[in-house]
Amino acid sequence: MAVPKRRMSRANTRSRRAQWKAEKTELVGVTVAGQRHKVPRRLLKAARLGLIDLDRR
């Protein structure tokens, strides 16, 4: 594992960390039992198989 040679200042550390941003999950439309729902892509198959309750929010 890489070890820093010198201590990094608090300002530099925080400005570096501020560059990272979380991305919103992309929602995909799916029709289940005649109703249209928007779910994340990773839950698409589970929604089609009825493994998750889409009516509960």
Swiss-Prot record:
Sections of the chain in a coiled coil: none
Any one biological process term the GO annotation gives: translation
Domain of life according to the entry: Bacteria
Protein name as it appears in the record: Large ribosomal subunit protein bL32
Stored InterPro entries: Ribosomal_bL32, Ribosomal_zn-bd
Gene Ontology MF terms: structural constituent of ribosome
Similarity remark: Belongs to the bacterial ribosomal protein bL32 family.
GO CC entries: large ribosomal subunit
SUPFAM superfamilies membership: Zn-binding ribosomal proteins
